[in-house]
């Protein structure tokens, strides 16, 4: 009789254990889908990085930087691709045209950004910080092309003899490039540091070079 009772208890124990394991497995299967949703969330964040649009005072789009996961794409007002800007494995910013031809590089070293040729054999321009809080753009011979000084509401781009070229004005979330206080060349309401925006006022550079330099400067906030 005792043997029969013992066998009954063992059978009941085994059944209870099997049910418990089965329930645990079901719980895990239910929780897995919620864990797999973490990756799409990160993807969605990257996907919301929209366009940095540069518009005339009348609202016409002149050009834009389309932010991508590994860089940016420069397009004109008709959404035609002009250049691709990407950081390579070494941290250099590579500038290519729509046909994948390398146009140049931007290298950030110790508070200066060097615009190099496609072969990386020559420094074309150097954008560097100054001890007074300003910046300079120099050519390959290290001769000043522009002086950039901070103002109460942005920056001023001037020649080496201090003749004003452009003013960069920051007001109510809008950054404007102005020839005079009343003449706006273009502006943006997109997220871009004012000093990075200033690079688009360097007329000695091509638009592709301006965009590559602005992208590199924006990554570090101009530091």
Question: What is each residue range found by the language model?
Answer:
Residues 1-9:
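Bacterial N-terminal signal peptides that target proteins for export
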Residues 17-20:
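C-terminal motif of bacterial Sec signal peptides marking the signal peptidase cleavage site
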Residues 24-223:
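Intrinsically disordered, low-complexity proline/glycine-rich segments
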């Amino acid at each position: 009789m005792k043997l029969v009772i013992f066998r009954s208890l063992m059978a009941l124990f085994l059944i209870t254990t099997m049910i418990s394991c089965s329930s645990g497995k079901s719980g895990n299967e239910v929780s897995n889908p919620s864990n797999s949703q973490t990756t799409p969330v990160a993807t969605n964040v990257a996907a919301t990085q929209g366009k940095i649009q540069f518009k005339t005072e009348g609202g016409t789009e002149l050009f834009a930087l389309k932010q991508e996961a590994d860089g940016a794409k420069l397009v004109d007002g008709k959404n035609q691709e002009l250049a691709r800007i990407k950081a390579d494995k070494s941290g250099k910013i590579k500038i290519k045209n729509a046909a994948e031809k390398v146009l140049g590089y931007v290298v950030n070293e110790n508070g200066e950004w060097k615009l190099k040729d496609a072969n990386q054999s020559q420094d074309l321009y150097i954008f560097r910080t100054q001890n007074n809080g300003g910046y300079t753009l120099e050519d390959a011979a290290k001769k000043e092309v522009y002086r950039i000084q901070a103002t109460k509401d942005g920056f001023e781009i001037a020649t080496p003899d201090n003749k004003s070229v452009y003013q960069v004005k920051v007001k109510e979330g809008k950054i404007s490039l102005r020839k005079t206080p009343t003449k706006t060349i273009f502006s943006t309401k997109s997220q871009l540091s004012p000093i990075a925006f200033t690079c688009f006022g360097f007329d000695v550079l091509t638009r592709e070079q301006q965009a590559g330099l602005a992208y590199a400067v924006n990554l570090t906030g101009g530091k």
